[in-house]
């Protein structure tokens, strides 16, 4: 089960702040909650330290019949998502559609989706001096995982994200807005890195010359998916774009997936990025900031389990061209994250939250080592996928 760091915010706070938060920070969520259309009176607010981007809180209220209601309150990071209207439009369209069509492996009914709770005046979010806030439904009796605790779990993760991909065919891609331009355009990310190297704003380039050289030796990889999209060789689809294992909620009793969360990056893209991102995280034998790079490798057993689940769910909707690019998907997205972490380190750690100096560099080195291992194992990855294609009757040849 994922370990959350939770800070309790008192409803009647003392004069001194706790847990390093200022009084203003502690009072902020409490003052925001009253603007949303929810049941009961607030009895508890807890800050959930999870994720790199938004600030998240668990809100508990008590109704007149002594029933406890739970919600998720988030302050949206407007540096990452400057167009909040577009973000929330995508969120509503996606969740409303999924609420009628998505059936998860661990659910007996369609529509187990994190829904928006509007403000009292009917808006999708609240904008005030402290930022942009939204309220969402909360799931009880579930847990999430940062890494798979068994091959079977990763198989079910593949099933879940594959079902999401297949169901989202029903959403008109032209109605989904691009809230982060070039989010998974690896070639564009590389050009951004070169720009950061040229500017060297905090004088860190000299310490990362080996990493820069490794990235530059892989430029032929970066455009494999984005160029296929741009040329129309593969279709643009509505994708999740953040298929981390911890964006799946598992039932505490059955241990099956019951919901997919974090729809902020749902945008026009390619399922190759979604598939590759899941593999990047789930097959890594080390943590994402592991200093001992000898521990970093791609677990091919886990790779096969996820591939089986994913293709079982949505392989029949993927084109021959998509299937033939699938072996490269994990390599492309792993290189992309290595680039992004390296760029943030060079820029002075302005995007990702860090817990210690140099963490973004550790993250980058881990991704680049994982890329190196995936590259060496590419022949085995091809064999795994071809075996699954043949078993499932998918028309593609990757050998």
What spans do the regions from the language model cover?
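Catalytic activation segment of kinase domains across protein kinase-like and atypical kinase folds
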Residues: 247-277, 281-285
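Conserved ATP-binding subdomain of kinase catalytic cores across diverse folds
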Residues: 52-55, 60-62, 69-71, 76-191, ...
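Short, Lys/Arg-enriched N-terminal segments with co-localized hydrophobic residues
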Residues: 7-22
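Juxta-kinase regulatory segment immediately upstream of eukaryotic protein kinase catalytic domains
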Residues: 23-43
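Hydrophobic alpha-helical bundle architecture
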Residues: 137, 309-330
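Active-site activation/catalytic loop segments of kinase-like enzymes and analogous catalytic loops
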Residues: 272-316, 332-351
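ATP-dependent phospho-/nucleotidyl transfer catalytic cores
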Residues: 46, 50, 75, 82-85, ...
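ATP/Mg2+ or Mg2+-diphosphate-binding catalytic cores
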Residues: 336-399
């Amino acid at each position: 089960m994922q370990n959350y760091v939770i800070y309790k915010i008192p409803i009647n706070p003392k004069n001194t702040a706790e847990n390093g938060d200022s009084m203003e920070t502690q009072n902020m969520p409490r003052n925001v909650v009253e603007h949303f259309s929810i049941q009961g009176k607030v009895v508890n607010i807890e800050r959930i330290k999870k994720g790199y981007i938004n600030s998240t809180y668990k809100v508990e209220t008590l109704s007149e019949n002594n029933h406890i209601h739970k919600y998720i309150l988030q302050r949206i990071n407007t540096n990452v998502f400057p167009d909040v209207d577009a973000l929330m439009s995508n969120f509503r369209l996606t969740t409303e559609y999924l609420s009628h069509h998505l059936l998860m492996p661990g659910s007996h009914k369609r529509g187990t989706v994190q829904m928006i709770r509007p403000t009292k005046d009917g808006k999708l979010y609240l904008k005030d001096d402290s930022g942009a806030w939204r309220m969402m439904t909360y799931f009880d009796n579930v847990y999430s995982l940062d890494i798979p605790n068994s091959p079977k779990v990763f198989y079910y993760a593949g099933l879940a994200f594959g079902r999401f991909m297949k169901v989202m065919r029903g959403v008109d891609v032209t109605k989904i807005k691009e809230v982060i331009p070039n989010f998974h355009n690896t070639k564009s990310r590389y050009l951004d890195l070169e720009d950061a190297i040229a500017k060297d704003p905090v004088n860190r380039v000299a310490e990362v010359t080996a990493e820069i050289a490794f990235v530059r030796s892989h430029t032929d990889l970066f455009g494999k998916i984005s160029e296929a999209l741009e040329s129309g060789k593969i279709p643009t689809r509505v994708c999740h774009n953040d298929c981390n294992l911890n964006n799946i909620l598992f039932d505490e009793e059955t241990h099956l997936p019951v919901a997919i969360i974090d729809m902020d990056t749902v945008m026009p893209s390619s399922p190759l990025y979604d598939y590759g991102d899941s593999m990047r995280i789930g097959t890594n034998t080390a943590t994402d900031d592991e200093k001992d790079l000898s521990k970093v490798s791609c677990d091919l057993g886990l790779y096969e389990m996820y591939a089986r689940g994913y293709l079982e769910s949505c392989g029949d909707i993927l084109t021959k061209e998509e299937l033939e690019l699938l072996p490269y998907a994990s390599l492309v997205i792993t290189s992309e994250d290595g680039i992004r972490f390296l760029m943030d380190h060079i820029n002075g750690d302005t995007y990702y939250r860090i817990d210690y100096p140099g963490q973004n560099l550790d993250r980058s080195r881990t991704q680049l080592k994982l890329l190196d291992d995936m590259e060496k194992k590419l022949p085995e990855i091809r064999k795994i996928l071809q075996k699954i294609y043949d078993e499932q009757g998918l028309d593609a040849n990757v050998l």
